[in-house]
């Protein structure tokens, strides 16, 4: 007769063998994107078997993240008190985003300096899953030591022209996590809509969040006659911020000023230049640049201070507030006696200096709340604050980046020559009329992959001021997620490698092989990417239409 104690020990031993047994030989090397900084893989040998899942240490808080990531990739997990398969250790020398990863037939060890480093190690792990010789899932033996080249690896969501529902933003965040992006730039206010809830000023969303119509997709000169409105609630904003945080992503909010302010001024007309002829503010129904700018008065600055207070509460994780600062026409300020009086009282020579004065006033509010100002490269016009961070988007003006770096400012590279993903991916004709774009620039994934974020001629001692790079996706002609995905993927994977991988390790042919191995994952997630071979949408039945809001 077998005693109960002996039987329990036997079952536990079998359970341990079942979970911890080495795999059959793993023949396939990882197809990780972005490519790690240093990786040694031993194929043709036994690896770590995933046939029965992974045991995680139940008392380690990192196991919650590991459980989520493994299960999202079809691997079972179990929380155990002893004999865990993954060993987590902390190593501050690896920095905030670096990690070490070792896989043997018996265990997986992850060392990192923070939760973010652990997340990146886990993403490298699940991207390395392959079939062993018997067809079972396994990890090859490997050693990885990795860290990103740049600290800012971003994508932008423009919710003003077309509003992206929270469920879709979460899908975007899931994809960003896989490819080690760490910044979501959320464009929340513009001429065509204000989507950010500000409790003290409810008309910003009830009035500023609604436009009478939009241009027909593919024809900016013709209206569709369909009202369009919407905004996020405070709870939705907090939900997105939390969801992003769990995936190692910081959400940077953008509120446009002093230009691109039509929606705010339509909601509260006293914020505009009320003393000019023909003053009739409204939420704009057409795309492009519009003339309505905030008036540089104390009333406006009190309003902006209130808005910034609420932004800080909604986005506590963000070290920055993005204030736009781009494409601010000066004609209303030139016509406004009030604006001219502000210029005279403050010794400002022209309207460009008035814009700089405006931005410096706002920057002081932001800095006083423990955050930093970031804006588009036009914030340099009239003089740039030494503590501001600048997003460089005008590739046709390379001196802008050089001037900011020479002054000591940090920059993020978002050049429209490479990283405006609303531009057509090319090559090939659009799959259908609704896939047309108004811009015929063909920015292929190869073109994106060829980007060098550090501007040519940058002195070595200034290179650290180049924080990284980001793709911008303006949504005038991108009405919903399937069209957004068609523009963003696979180019986002090329950008992920540009932003992460050491320059000397980049290889376009090798990247293409790894890209092809990523496509089944995108297919499984229902991503409507543009197929790199023929330009067709991956989800041909996806509906590319503007939802009535």
UniProtKB/Swiss-Prot annotation:
Active site residues of this protein: 190, 260, 327
EC class name: hydrolase
Gene3D superfamilies for this protein: Chitobiase/beta-hexosaminidase domain 2-like, Glycosidases
Thermal dependence summary for this entry: Highest activity at 45 degrees Celsius. Has about 40% of activity at 55 degrees Celsius.
Chain intervals for the UniProt region annotation (Disordered): 526-549
pH sensitivity of activity: Optimum pH is approximately 7. Stable activity from pH 4.5 to 8.5. Retains more than 30% of activity at pH 9.0.
UniProt keyword annotations, A-Z: Carbohydrate metabolism, Glycosidase, Hydrolase, Polysaccharide degradation, Signal
Chain segments annotated as coiled-coil in the UniProt record: none
Membership in a protein family: Belongs to the glycosyl hydrolase 20 family.
Protein name: Beta-hexosaminidase Amuc_0868
């Amino acid at each position: 007769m077998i005693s109960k104690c002996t039987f329990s020990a036997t079952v536990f031993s079998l359970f341990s063998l079942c979970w911890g047994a080495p795999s059959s030989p793993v023949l396939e090397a990882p197809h990780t994107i972005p490519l790690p900084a240093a990786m040694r893989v031993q194929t043709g040998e036994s690896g770590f078997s995933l046939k029965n899942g992974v045991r995680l240490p139940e008392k380690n808080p990192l196991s919650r993240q590991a459980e989520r990531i493994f299960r999202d990739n079809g691997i079972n997990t179990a929380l155990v008190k002893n004999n865990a398969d993954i060993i987590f250790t902390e190593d501050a020398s690896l920095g905030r985003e670096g990690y070490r990863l070792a896989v043997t037939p018996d265990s997986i060890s992850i060392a990192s300096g923070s939760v973010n480093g652990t997340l990146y190690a886990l993403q490298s792990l699940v991207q390395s899953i392959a079939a062993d010789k018997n067809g079972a899932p396994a990890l090859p033996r490997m050693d990885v030591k990795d860290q990103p080249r740049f600290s800012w690896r971003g994508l932008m969501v423009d919710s003003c022209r077309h509003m992206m529902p929270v469920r879709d933003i979460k899908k975007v965040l899931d994809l960003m996590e896989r490819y080690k992006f760490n910044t979501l730039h959320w464009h929340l206010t513009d001429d065509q809509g204000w989507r950010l809830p500000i409790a003290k000023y409810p008309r910003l969303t009830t009035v500023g969040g609604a436009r009478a119509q939009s241009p027909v997709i593919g024809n900016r000169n013709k209206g569709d006659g369909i009202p369009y409105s919407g905004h996020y609630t405070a709870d939705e904003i907090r939900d997105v911020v939390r969801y992003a945080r769990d995936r190692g992503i910081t959400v940077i909010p953008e509120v446009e000023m002093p230009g691109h302010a039509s929606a705010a001024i339509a909601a509260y007309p006293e914020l505009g230049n009320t003393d000019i002829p023909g003053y009739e503010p409204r939420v704009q129904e057409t795309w492009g640049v519009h003339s309505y700018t905030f008036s540089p008065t104390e009333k406006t600055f009190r309003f902006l201070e209130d808005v910034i207070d609420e932004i800080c509460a909604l986005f506590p994780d963000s070290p920055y507030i993005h204030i736009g600062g781009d494409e601010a026409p000066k004609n209303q300020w030139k016509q406004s006696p009030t604006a001219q009086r502000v210029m005279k009282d403050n010794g400002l020579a022209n309207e460009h200096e008035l814009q700089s004065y405006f931005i410096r006033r706002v920057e002081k509010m932001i800095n006083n709340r423990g955050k930093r100002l970031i804006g588009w490269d036009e914030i340099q016009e009239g003089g740039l604050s030494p503590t501001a961070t600048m997003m460089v988007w005008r590739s046709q003006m390379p001196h802008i980046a050089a001037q900011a770096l020479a002054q000591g400012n940090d920059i993020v590279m978002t050049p429209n020559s490479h990283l405006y993903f609303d531009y057509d991916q090319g090559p090939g004709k659009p799959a259908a009329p609704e896939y047309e774009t108004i811009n015929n620039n063909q920015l292929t994934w190869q073109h994106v992959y060829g980007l060098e974020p550090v501007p040519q001629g940058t002195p070595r001692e200034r290179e650290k001021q180049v924080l990284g790079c980001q793709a911008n996706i303006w949504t005038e002609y991108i009405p919903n997620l399937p069209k957004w995905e068609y523009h963003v993927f696979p180019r986002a994977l090329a950008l992920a490698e540009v932003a992460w991988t050491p320059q000397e390790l980049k290889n376009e042919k090798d990247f293409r092989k790894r890209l092809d191995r990523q496509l089944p994952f995108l297919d499984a997630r229902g991503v409507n990417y543009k197929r790199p071979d023929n330009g067709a949408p991956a989800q041909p039945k996806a509906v590319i239409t503007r939802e009535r809001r």
